[in-house]
Amino acid sequence: MKTGLIILFILPLYLSAQNQYPVAVQAVLAKAGANKIELTKALDFFYQKGDSLKIKAIEFLVANMDIHYSASYYWQDSSGRKVPYNELAYPTYADAIDALQSLKQQNSQLTPVAFTYRDIDSIKADFLIDNVERAFEVRLRSWAEKITFDQFCEYILPYRASIEPLQNWRGTYQQKFGWINDSANGKTMEATLQYFANDQKKWFINTYDIENRKEPLPRLGSLQLLQRKKGPCEDIADLMVFALRSQGILVTNDMVSYWATSTGSHFFNSTLNDSLQPIRFDVSSSTVRFTTFA
């Protein structure tokens, strides 16, 4: 009898906690199915900490989550059985390719199968919590100190760049690109972006007009970018999103759907200059190209 009373007492408290979320958040939670528990775990983590800005940040991520998804693939044998393989389990991409070749020898007619999965169905609480905490670690760096909190939420806080497979990237990128804090200290935004571009060209190959990706993978994941060290303009644009956001620099992807002089689209990035005016920049070319918005 006492146990029943305790359960009845806890249930209204739980329902009350659910109702404290903004309407937009509740709408996404209603679509999340079994993964709702992960989203509420992340929300409640920050609610319990009581930091009003971090609460707004996690609410922003969840409220806008239902439109986002990942495009990925897996390997399947001739019987339709999924064959386990994770290229990030190997120290280098060359090792991963060798392992894949071994799998192909062991499994007849190994073929890639494309699939998509929604963020609201798959994202984990720990991933969201880490993303928010690390984004706030760089929020007050010199590049971000002039922007509004809404701009921070739109262009630094987000955990993905496009439709790439989700991978826990912030800690790795914060460490890999932390050198920019010394190298570009006191420099203009344009000069800072040139530092990033110079670094990228030392280790990342632009594969445009050189090779086409054989797997049905529209975008490399954040950690795949660091391991494969090559990709076309859309991957380079995503790489810049991860690298700049990891250091507290506002950035987003931009694109031209069709060139007047050629077929196909082209991807690049946008940010704000020191006067807080939007500028486009493209690091995929031999020198960084800057253009202002009309």
Per-range role (PLM):
Residues Y21-G33, Y47-Q48, D182-D199, R213-L223, ...:
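Hydrophobic/aromatic-rich core segments of domains that either
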Residues G4-L8, E59-F60, T111, Q277:
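Residue-level marker of intrinsically disordered, low-complexity segments enriched
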Residues M1-Y21:
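Bacterial Sec-dependent N-terminal signal peptides
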Residues E38-K41, K49-R228:
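Secondary-structure boundary elements
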